[in-house]
């Protein structure tokens, strides 16, 4: 993509309403625009990141055996009355009527609807286990939306729902999602730590939050430092095998949010030199809620003995749009964003330091053409901005690799490559630049 043809509305000053780093940088970098309190338009740069994150989430859900569908944003109020949650949910649920006075709601979550879909088609235990997921926009009418996409009213979520004949099977499904989440966040360059959590309005008695450590996080967390060094399962993980050892490994060392923190246990089990008290951002949560919805909504299947029984369910959420902010909170410096390569809007930025000069134009065009042919996402800054402004823009929007092409370097047949993550620079021959970037 040529920057001269791309829509990138960079802001020179930080809007006053932006309180945290991710909100400030997303606005300044032209990733989004606020349309109403807690509601944002995703501009091209931000949308590219959102799509990269969504793709990783989808790939790991598919790898774990979940099956994608898509449910509507609007739901019938009667479904929620059937489960008993319509009145239990507070004013954060947006309730509306259509022209026929039918009561609807803008779904904040989808347990009722997925249960309705399941009970309409599945009759036997032979169709289980089953895990269905979708990635859809949701709305919760937060009383005080703030922090940009971290606590907005409209947000993109991945929701998966598992169905099993009994608790044993349901816990196996829970473990699959537990491991899938470890892999999902690791692929995004994040260290997300699973912590035992309250179940809240979802219900059930088993839940884990996945927390990314960040000083600007909304939750205080207490962890054993050893958990930071635990290995993440590789692509060869067997989702049909016994995942209990992996789950046990990740849940044995102490890790808790302040809501469920046990100070006495923490001091008893964790040596002082391994205690870490910091803050974190929730990027996902998983639940096992048993027969909470299947009993009230009569989602029954015939067991091996032919007798109908309620299924055991679980739900598994990832805040896709929230992850954009969480990654920025964990990956930034004073100059701007430092995107992990897997989620960056572009992988390489080519900076033409003397636009209009024949040699620099030709070298940039060559690099742009060769990298694009190899499938690399390239942003070619072919604008007439001065070099300093180009450096600042590339740093602000966080492109992982920057290639500086100027007449001084080209006089020696070289270009300069900068790695945004750690700031390292190296001069390489022009003809070797593509190979170096592909290494």
Swiss-Prot record:
Instruction: State a GO cellular component annotated for this protein.
Output: cytosol
Q: Which UniProt keywords apply?
A: Aminoacyl-tRNA synthetase, ATP-binding, Cytoplasm, Ligase, Nucleotide-binding, Protein biosynthesis
Q: Which InterPro entries match?
A: aa-tRNA-synt_IIb, aa-tRNA-synth_II, aa-tRNA-synth_II/BPL/LPL, Anticodon-bd, Anticodon-bd_dom_sf, Pro-tRNA-ligase_IIa, Pro-tRNA-synth_IIa_bac-type, Pro-tRNA_synthetase
Q: Which EC number(s) are documented for this chain?
A: 6.1.1.15
Location(s), subcellular: Cytoplasm
Q: What is its main location?
A: cytoplasm
Q: Which family does it belong to?
A: Belongs to the class-II aminoacyl-tRNA synthetase family. ProS type 2 subfamily.
| PANTHER family for this protein | MITOCHONDRIAL RIBOSOME PROTEIN L39/PROLYL-TRNA LIGASE FAMILY MEMBER, PROLINE--TRNA LIGASE
Q: What is this protein called?
A: Proline--tRNA ligase
Q: Which organism is it from?
A: Nitrobacter hamburgensis (strain DSM 10229 / NCIMB 13809 / X14)
């Amino acid at each position: 993509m040529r920057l001269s043809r791309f829509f990138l509305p960079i802001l020179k000053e930080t809007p006053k309403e932006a309180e945290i780093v991710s909100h400030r940088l997303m606005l300044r970098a032209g990733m989004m625009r606020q349309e109403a309190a807690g509601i944002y338009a995703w501009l091209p740069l931000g949308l590219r990141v959102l799509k990269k994150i969504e793709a990783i989430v989808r790939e790991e859900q598919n790898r774990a055996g979940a099956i994608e569908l898509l449910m509507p944003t609007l739901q019938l109020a009667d479904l929620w009355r059937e489960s008993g949650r319509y009145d239990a949910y507070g004013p954060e649920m947006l309730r509306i009527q259509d022209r026929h006075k039918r009561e609807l709601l803008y779904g904040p979550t989808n347990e009722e609807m997925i249960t309705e879909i399941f009970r309409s088609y599945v009759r036997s235990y032979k169709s289980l286990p089953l895990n269905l997921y979708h990635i859809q926009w949701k709305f919760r009418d937060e009383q005080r939306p703030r922090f940009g996409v971290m606590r907005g009213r409209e947000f993109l979520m991945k929701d998966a729902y598992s169905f099993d004949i009994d608790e044993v099977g349901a816990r196996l499904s829970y473990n699959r999602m537990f491991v899938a989440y470890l892999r999902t966040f690791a692929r995004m360059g994040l260290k997300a730590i699973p912590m035992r959590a309250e179940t809240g309005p979802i219900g059930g008695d088993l839940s884990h939050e996945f927390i990314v450590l960040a000083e600007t996080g909304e939750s205080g967390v207490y962890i054993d430092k050893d958990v930071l060094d635990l290995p993440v399962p590789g692509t060869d993980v067997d989702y049909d095998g016994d995942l209990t050892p992996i789950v046990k490994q990740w849940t044995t060392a102490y890790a808790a949010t302040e809501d469920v923190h046990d100070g006495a246990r923490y001091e008893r089990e964790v040596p002082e030199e391994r205690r870490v008290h910091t803050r974190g951002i929730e990027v996902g949560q998983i639940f096992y809620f048993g027969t909470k919805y299947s009993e009230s909504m009569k989602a029954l299947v015939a067991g091996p003995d032919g007798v109908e029984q309620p299924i055991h369910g679980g739900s598994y959420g990832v805040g896709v749009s929230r992850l954009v902010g969480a990654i920025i909170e964990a990956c930034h410096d004073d100059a701007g964003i430092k995107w992990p390569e897997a989620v960056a809007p572009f992988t390489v930025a080519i900076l033409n330091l003397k636009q209009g000069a024949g040699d620099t134009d030709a070298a940039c065009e060559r690099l742009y053409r060769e990298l694009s042919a190899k499938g690399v996402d390239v942003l070619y800054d072919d604008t007439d901005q001065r070099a300093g402004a180009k450096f600042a823009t590339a740093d602000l929007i966080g492109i992982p690799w920057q290639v500086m092409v100027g007449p001084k370097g080209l006089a020696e047949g070289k270009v300069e490559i900068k790695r945004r993550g750690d700031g390292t620079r190296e001069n390489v021959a022009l003809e070797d630049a593509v190979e170096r970037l592909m290494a």
